[in-house]
Every structure is written in C-alpha cells, then in structure tokens.
Swiss-Prot record:
Lineage: Bacteria, Bacillati, Bacillota, Bacilli, Bacillales
The protein, known as: Heme sensor protein HssS
Start and end residues of each HAMP domain: 186-238
Organism of provenance: Staphylococcus aureus (strain bovine RF122 / ET3-1)
Gene3D superfamilies: 1.10.287.130, 6.10.340.10, Histidine kinase-like ATPase, C-terminal domain
The EC number(s) this enzyme carries: 2.7.13.3
Domain Histidine kinase: 246-456
Gene: hssS
Predominant localisation class: membrane
Membrane topology: Multi-pass membrane protein
PROSITE patterns: HAMP, HIS_KIN
General function of this protein: Member of the two-component regulatory system HssS/HssR involved in intracellular heme homeostasis and tempering of staphylococcal virulence. HssS functions as a heme sensor histidine kinase which is autophosphorylated at a histidine residue and transfers its phosphate group to an aspartate residue of HssR. HssR/HssS activates the expression of hrtAB, an efflux pump, in response to extracellular heme, hemin, hemoglobin or blood.
InterPro entries according to UniProt: Bact_Sensor_His_Kinase (IPR050398), HAMP_dom (IPR003660), HATPase_C_sf (IPR036890), His_kinase_dom (IPR005467), HisK_dim/P_dom (IPR003661), HisK_dim/P_sf (IPR036097), Sig_transdc_His_kin-like_C (IPR004358)
PANTHER family per the UniProt record, alphabetical: HISTIDINE KINASE, SENSOR HISTIDINE KINASE CPXA
Membrane spanning residue stretches: 9-29, 164-184
Subcellular localization, as worded in the UniProt entry: Cell membrane
Length: 457
C-alpha cells in the first residue's frame, strides 16, 4: 500500500492524531454523560424555578414579554398552554422532539428533567444537542391558566465567540501537528535514504566509502553498525581476492612445471631422464591432489553448519595412531618422538581432530633438525584438555610468528608446502570451541599448545 517509509510514517502519525481526537471526543462525551449531565440539569432547573418565583412575585403584565426577555438573555424557551399551543422564545430549536406525554406531565405539575434523562449517544454530546426534549420543564401559573415552560441555555449563542476561538485553535493545532509530523518524518527518513544509497554502493562493490554517523539514537547505532559491516565486508572481499590469487598461483606454478616436464619428456629419448621426468610429474600431481583435498577441507570448515561434533574420541589413542602413521617420516630424519599422554575422552569430530593433530606432527617433523626430538603431552587442567607439541629447530622471527596461521603463508619461497596446514588446524580447533597458541623459548624450542573444553562428562 505504501511505497515509501516516508509516506507510511506520515500517514500513521496523522492517523494517530485524528484517531486520538476522535477518542478524546468520545471520552469527553462519556464524561459529560456520567459526571456533568445531572448537575447541568439541576442548575438549569434552579434557574427556571427562580424565574417562576420572580414571575409569581413580580407579576409582570405580559408574561410573553417576560419570556422574550429571558430569550434575549441566551435561553431557549418553549411554552405550551392547555390547548397545546406552542410558543418559542430566543433562538429557535433545531428540532421539536418533546413528547406529548412529557408536556402533559408538566401541565399536571410534574417537573421535567430532559437534560438529565437524555439517552447517551456516542457521537452526539448532550450538552450541545439543541432539541426540545433536551430541556428542563416546570408548570407556570398565569392569569390565563397553567402553562408548561421548557428551557435550556442557548449554547450556540453563549459560546459563539468561544466556538470560533476553539475552531481556529483546533485547525491551527491540526495544521501545525501535521506540518511537524511531515518535517520530523523527513528528518527520520533522510539518514535511512543515505543508508539505502550506501547499500547500493556496497552491492556495486564499493567497500571504501563510509557513511557519516549523524545521530546518537537507534538510527545512529544503525549507521555505526553499517560502517562496521562495510569494513568487515571489505576485509572479506580482500581476503577473497587474496585467496583467489593464492589458489591461482598454487595451481598455475605446478601446472607450468608439468607442462615443461612434458615438453622435455617428448624431446628426450634417454630412459633415465624420461623416468626422472615421470617421477617429477607424479610428485607434482600428488601435491596438486593434496592441495585440492585441503581446499575442499577449507570450504567444508568455512561452511560448517552440516558438520557433526558428537564422536566419542579417545584422544590419547588418536595421538598414538597419528604417531605410528608418521613414524617412518620421523625415522628418516632420526628423530625421537616422546609422548606423555593421559587417558582422556573428548566429544567432537574425530576426522577433523585427527587432521588438526596430524598437521602439527607433520609440521614438527618437517622443521626439526636431523637427530632432534619432538615432545608431545596430553593432560587435564581444571575443566580443559591441554595438548602440547614441542620441537627444536631454527628460530622463528616475530614477523613470521604473526602470520603462522594465515592461509597460503609460507615461511620460505623454497617451501614445497601449500601453506594451508596451520590455517586448517586453527579452524578445526576453533570449531571445537578451543584455542591454539604458538610460543618459542630462548633455546629455539617451538611449542604449539591446544586448549579444548573438557566436554566428556
């Protein structure tokens, strides 16, 4: 129905104003009916009886002149004689609705309280209802016999100036209120429109242009969070571009190498060289296969909603299996692996945890000097499980340490890895609600420490 928020807020606000005015009128009408009507009836009846008392004591020569004088004093009067003849004084009534039964009762000396007994009408205020049954009536004795006199104040005449004042006041109130509603709505909508334009810029890929935070209310908070979102999206976009560049590089380099080896293979007839080229191609394709596997694993970790973490894992046994699997690589470098493992159970994803711990051991074997040692420990600590793996090797600079867990980061250009192992390990540990830290001692002993929650109970 509303195509703009501006129109919606403006229409809603104006509707609230008009609806409030209507409800106020109805409530005022109810208040008059239940609280003021009886007292108003009594006051007018008192005035009419005082008029009768004056008429009886002063005995004016022409009673009609007396009623005419009352009419000039802003009263509306209707008299009915015993023949049913009606005479009106003052401003005319809007409608003659008085029943004959009420007239007869007054002629028989019964007071009439039409104002007090006026039925309630939701949208008609009895105070202003200018009809003959909304009057009070008593019997007057004249020289020509009894007459029934019905009277009510002439509200229209009495409050004519006030009604004009009130009408002008209400019109100005509505005009000013609606004008302020439109102006305030525009003030609210303006920053929303700027947000809309900023959103369109985001869609077009502009992550650099911020929006100015102009307020301190909810819209100001929205502006602040929009800027934070813009910064985050910009970082994600940079990471995406960096990721694509790295993947392209990691794939292009071995493919170029394979292409070169195939060319050499075609041109040589030396069996030894041909076998060497074939072996090199096999090694490179194996590395490409490993890269593909790790990229798929990264994608799985980034979209982890479908992953389950309900495997009951015997962590110490898992570590023993990993050590046994990598023992051959350790033996080739004459490395000693020392393991101090407590018996610990853990609830998680066994496949992923196996991958994370394997990456750390493979990394330790790779960077430990020949004849060195690798220390592995697993223990409880309060409500946590602590896993540490330490090895001696070359020192790591603070610059390298700060980027160890970045995707595709390599310590050296001559490193034949793809730089994803530690990034994958960190993601897996965080998905298990754990942390991983790297420390280095003065003796060039590097240590990776994994802390996991003890969730087996």
């Amino acid at each position: 129905m509303f195509k703009t928020l501006y129109a919606r807020i403006a229409i809603y606000s104006i509707t609230v104003i008009l609806f409030s005015a209507l409800i106020s009128f109805v409530l005022t009408n109810v208040y008059y009916h239940y609280n003021l009507k009886a007292s108003n009836d009594a006051k007018i009846m008192k005035t009419l009886k005082e008029a009768r008392q004056y008429e009886q004591s002063a005995k004016p020569t022409h009673i009609q002149q007396y009623f005419k004088h009352l009419g000039q004093m802003n009263y509306q009067i209707m008299t009915v004689d015993q023949k049913g003849h009606k005479t009106f004084y003052g401003e005319p009534f809007r409608e003659d609705t008085l029943s004959q039964n009420a007239i007869n009762n007054v002629l028989n000396n019964k007071d009439y309280h039409g104002i007090k007994d006026k039925p309630f009408a939701l949208f008609v205020t009895g105070f202003f209802d200018n009809v003959t049954d909304n009057t009070v009536g008593i019997n007057f004795k004249t020289k020509d016999g009894s007459i029934a006199v019905f009277m009510r104040p002439d509200i229209g005449e009495t409050f004519s100036e006030f009604r004009t004042f009130l009408a002008v006041l209400l019109m100005l109130l509505l005009f000013i209120s609606i004008s302020l509603v439109i102006a305030s709505t525009h003030s609210i909508i303006r920053p929303v429109k700027k947000l809309k334009l900023a959103t369109e810029r985001l869609i077009d890929g502009d992550f650099k242009t911020p929006i100015k935070q102009t307020r301190k209310d909810e819209i100001g908070t929205l502006q602040y969070h929009f800027n934070k979102m813009r910064e985050s999206l910009g970082q994600v976009d940079q990471m995406r571009q960096h990721f694509v560049q790295n993947v392209s590089h990691e794939i292009k380099t071995p493919l170029t190498h394979i292409h070169h080896l195939l060319s050499e293979l075609q041109q040589t007839s030396d069996k030894t060289l041909r076998q060497q080229y074939i072996n090199d191609i096999y090694t490179i394709t194996t590395q490409l296969s490993g890269l593909t596997t790790e990229l798929l694993l990264l994608s799985e970790l980034d979209n982890h909603q479908s992953l389950l973490f309900d495997d009951k894992i015997q962590v110490d046994q898992l570590i023993k299996d990993i050590i046994r699997h990598e023992q051959f690589a350790a033996d080739e470098k004459s490395l000693i692996i020392l393991a101090d493992l407590e018996s610990i159970n853990f609830l998680g994803n066994q496949r992923l945890l196996h991958q994370a711990l394997s990456n750390l051991l493979i990394n330790a074997i790779k960077y430990t000097d020949v004849g060195g040692a690798i220390d592995i420990a697993l223990q409880h600590s309060h409500n946590n499980i602590i896993f540490t793996i330490s090895n001696d090797g070359s020192p790591i600079s603070p610059q390298v340490e700060a980027r160890l867990f970045e995707r595709f980061y390599k310590v050296s250009k001559h490193d034949n890895s793809n730089g994803l192992g530690l990034a994958i390990t960190k993601s897996i540990i965080e998905l298990h609600h754990g942390t991983i830290q790297f420390t280095q001692s003065n003796e060039y002993i590097t240590t990776f420490t994994i802390t996991l929650p003890n969730n087996s109970h």
